[in-house]
């Protein structure tokens, strides 16, 4: 019997973000500044997946994401699973929930908004509309696509 082969090396302790839609791994690395922890980060792109066809995966050695950070990931990869690893074993498996509100992560794309350039904490209300994630700014009350806000 053939031993299963891992496409991406296992980690002893840290976080694995699995079942990221193929092509979104790099966006998550950038948006969540996962390279700034100073720890080893392993990324797999377009790996085979039984449920998705192909997927991306991110492994961060020595870093455990809290529930708030994990739920922020739902904006970019709602079907992703965040696994906490200890001694090479999954000790916690979290399925993501889209948060109702997100603060201090994105800047409002509206250049006339207080949330764009003023020293205030950005705040958006998160809604699903026709299968799309939409964010409504607390200050200017304009609604934007997730990608518009992420690029601002």
Swiss-Prot record:
**Source superkingdom:** Bacteria
In terms of InterPro entries, this protein maps to: Asp_carbamoyltransf_reg_N (IPR020545), Asp_carbamoylTrfase_reg (IPR002801), Asp_carbamoyltrfase_reg_C (IPR020542), Asp_carbatrfase_reg_C_sf (IPR036792), Asp_carbatrfase_reg_N_sf (IPR036793)
Entry's cofactor comment:
Binds 1 zinc ion per subunit.
- A cellular component term (GO) from this record? aspartate carbamoyltransferase complex
Cofactor names: Zn(2+)
Residues that bind Zn(2+), according to the entry? Answer: 108, 113, 137, 140
For biological process, the GO terms are: 'de novo' pyrimidine nucleobase biosynthetic process; pyrimidine nucleotide biosynthetic process
User: Which key words are in the record?
Assistant: Metal-binding, Pyrimidine biosynthesis, Zinc
Molecular function as annotated in GO: metal ion binding
Q: Which HAMAP family match?
A: Asp_carb_tr_reg
Role this protein plays: Involved in allosteric regulation of aspartate carbamoyltransferase.
Q: Which family does it belong to?
A: Belongs to the PyrI family.
Known partners and oligomeric status:
Contains catalytic and regulatory chains.
Record-given protein name: Aspartate carbamoyltransferase regulatory chain
| Native source species | Neisseria meningitidis serogroup B (strain ATCC BAA-335 / MC58)
